[in-house]
């Protein structure tokens, strides 16, 4: 039991007027540590007990069992709890030594599946920084869900269908060079895509020609299908090379095209449930009772299916295939209205499991404050960006530690980790401005800063030639080690908060706080001095490194032992 839960349970024993969960949520951390480790404000009981908060605090402080704490005192309207540092540090250190990287493993999920729709780039378009957010947020959430006892199923719902293929076929037939595309597939396809979109803005017949080619593709035309398959194959080769660099894997690459033969069933289900309504020659589902208007188009007058219809088929397929406990869509916040419609239509169809679906939205990545756009050619391509990040990391490592073994692997871990961490430390609903120099810095709230703290601890443990013993009791009581102990003890709750809120930034900020707390401890404590506290301090180092490494792993970031 963590200390916050312990305090809430002890207060609940003497305050039957409040639920333990409510007490837990009211607990505060005093700004000054001299005022205790946690405090309960008595204001919330004033109305119920019809007494002044100061009097309530004083009376309750006397009733609470102090045996679990160093002391419990009333200060004005607050009950302040001072925790038993020796006892708690001993328990926490023992837990980490015993469990190792499994420390804070939880069983909420009980092995149930979580479907995660993530990354999902468009075929024949370059993998840009804009795709990075969905990829790394989804990958981190998969790690977090696994830590919570779920079985993540990572789905790359490729954008391998749609009118853009009509545009690309038109462009290739006008200006395409097979040899050039084979030599540099994505670069050439991007040039063609940008060029045809520019032409479409001044020539309206381009759009019609593209629609015609896409209709041919839908009808199985041989030439259209062969070009589509070629564009898809070349793009996947490129994407998989990048995923390898990012150390991201998937359980499914079923994209839009996979569901082409599943549209009729969706339409039949909607019709059987009498949900389709005629509107100006098209078919819609009315969702006014959900506050959604206008109604989503299901089928156009020409028989073409729309975005919402093409989202219903994957939702149904995933429920049948994975019987998910949760289904998560890591997609930009500009798609919020679409996901509200999707859930509402499924609800109308009688599928209450739609409540288990969550749109994990995120903000935009900008460059110099400007929105990125593939269509306009204003993109930051991921592959050269990763290469540049690795080069910058290598330069800093060379300056700090020229004799480091395996510099290339460490530079890769630091460079890639820097890009991932910078993205994940940002509250996902907020966007951020892309700044590679800030990302790869070893100073500030960055991935390399946290990785360096971990490497520093490993260096200390190597110098000391120290391995903790599971049969020895270790404990600490000084103020700076106590700050670290409290963070380590809080790790299980941080994991659950990250999972409950679908918010990896909670974990990233925890990692920063733990690294900062250790660096402060390192600056003021002679860890390797040969005295009675040496082993206790080294165990604290070991526990900190264990939790830092695991926090980084949950974010999809490697933790080198040397830097």
Swiss-Prot record:
Instruction: Spell out the InterPro entries in the cross-references.
Output: Arg-tRNA-ligase (IPR001278), Arg-tRNA-synth_N (IPR005148), Arg-tRNA-synth_N_sf (IPR036695), ArgRS_core (IPR035684), DALR_anticod-bd (IPR008909), Rossmann-like_a/b/a_fold (IPR014729), tRNAsynth_Ia_anticodon-bd (IPR009080)
Q: Which UniProt keywords apply?
A: Aminoacyl-tRNA synthetase, ATP-binding, Cytoplasm, Ligase, Nucleotide-binding, Protein biosynthesis
Q: What class of enzyme is it?
A: ligase
Main localization is cytoplasm
Q: Where is this motif: 'HIGH' region?
A: 121-131
Query: What GO terms in the biological process aspect are recorded for it?
Result: arginyl-tRNA aminoacylation
Give yes or no: UniProt keyword Protein biosynthesis.
yes
> What Enzyme Commission number(s) apply to this enzyme?
6.1.1.19
Instruction: Drop me one GO molecular function for this one.
Output: ATP binding
Q: Where is the signal peptide?
A: none
Q: Which GO terms describe its cellular component?
A: cytoplasm
Could you tell me where this protein is found in the cell?
Answer: Cytoplasm
Q: Which reaction does it catalyse?
A: tRNA(Arg) + L-arginine + ATP = L-arginyl-tRNA(Arg) + AMP + diphosphate
- What Pfam family is a match for this entry? tRNA-synt_1d
Q: How does it assemble?
A: Monomer.
Q: Which family does it belong to?
A: Belongs to the class-I aminoacyl-tRNA synthetase family.
Task: Please identify the protein, giving its name as recorded.
Answer: Arginine--tRNA ligase
Q: Which organism is it from?
A: Streptococcus pyogenes serotype M49 (strain NZ131)
């Amino acid at each position: 039991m963590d200390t916050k839960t312990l305090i809430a349970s002890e207060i609940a024993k003497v305050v039957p007027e409040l639920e333990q969960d409510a007490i837990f949520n009211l607990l505060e951390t005093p700004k000054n540590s001299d005022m205790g480790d946690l405090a309960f404000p008595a204001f919330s009981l004033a109305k119920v007990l019809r007494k002044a908060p100061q009097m309530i605090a004083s009376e309750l402080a006397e009733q609470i069992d102090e045996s679990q704490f160093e002391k419990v005192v009333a200060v004005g309207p607050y009950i302040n709890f001072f925790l038993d540092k020796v006892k708690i540090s001993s328990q926490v250190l023992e837990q980490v030594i015993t469990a190792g990287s499994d420390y804070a493993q939880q069983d909420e999920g009980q092995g149930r599946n979580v479907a995660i729709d993530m990354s999902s780039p468009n075929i024949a378009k370059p993998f840009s920084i804009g795709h990075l957010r969905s990829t790394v947020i989804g990958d981190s959430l998969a790690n977090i869900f696994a830590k919570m006892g779920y079985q993540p199923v990572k789905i790359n719902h490729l954008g391998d269908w749609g009118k853009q293929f009509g545009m690309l076929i038109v462009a290739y037939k006008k200006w395409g060079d097979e040899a050039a595309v084979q030599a540099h597939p994505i670069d050439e396809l991007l040039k063609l895509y940008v060029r045809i979109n520019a032409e479409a803005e001044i020539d309206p017949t381009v759009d019609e020609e593209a629609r015609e080619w896409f209709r041919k593709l839908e009808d199985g035309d041989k030439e259209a299908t062969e070009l589509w398959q070629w564009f898809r194959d070349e793009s996947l080769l490129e994407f998989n090379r990048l995923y390898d660099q990012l150390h991201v894997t998937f359980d499914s690459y079923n994209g839009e095209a996979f569901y082409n033969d599943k549209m009729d069933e969706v339409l039949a289900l909607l019709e059987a449930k009498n949900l389709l309504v005629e509107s100006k020659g098209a078919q819609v589902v009315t969702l006014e009772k959900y506050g959604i208007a206008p109604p989503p188009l299901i089928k156009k007058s020409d028989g073409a299916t729309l975005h919402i219809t093409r989202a219903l088929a994957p939702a149904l397929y995933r429920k049948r295939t994975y019987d998910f406990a949760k289904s998560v869509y890591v997609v930009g916040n500009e798609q919020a209205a679409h996901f509200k419609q999707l859930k509402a239509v499924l609800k109308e169809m009688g599928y209450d499991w739609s409540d288990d679906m969550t749109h994990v939205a995120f903000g935009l990545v900008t460059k110099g404050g400007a929105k990125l756009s593939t269509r306009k050619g204003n993109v930051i391509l991921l592959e050269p960006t990763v290469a540049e990040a690795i080069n910058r990391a290598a330069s800093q490592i060379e300056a700090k530690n020229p004799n480091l073994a395996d510099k290339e692997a460490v530079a890769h871990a630091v460079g890639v980790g820097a890009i991932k961490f910078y993205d994940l430390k940002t509250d996902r609903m907020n966007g951020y401005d892309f700044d590679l120099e800030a990302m790869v810095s070893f100073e500030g709230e960055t991935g390399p800063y946290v990785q360096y703290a971990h490497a520093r601890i490993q260096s200390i443990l190597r110098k000391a030639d120290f391995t903790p013993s599971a049969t020895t009791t270790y404990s600490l009581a000084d103020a700076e080690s106590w700050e670290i102990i409290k963070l380590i003890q809080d790790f299980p709750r941080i994991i659950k908060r990250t999972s409950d809120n679908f918010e990896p930034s909670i974990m990233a900020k925890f990692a920063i706080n733990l690294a900062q707390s250790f660096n402060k401890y390192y600056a003021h404590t002679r860890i390797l001095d040969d005295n009675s506290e040496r082993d206790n301090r080294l165990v604290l180092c070991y526990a900190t490194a264990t939790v830092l490494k695991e926090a980084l792993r949950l974010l999809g970031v490697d933790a080198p032992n040397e830097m």
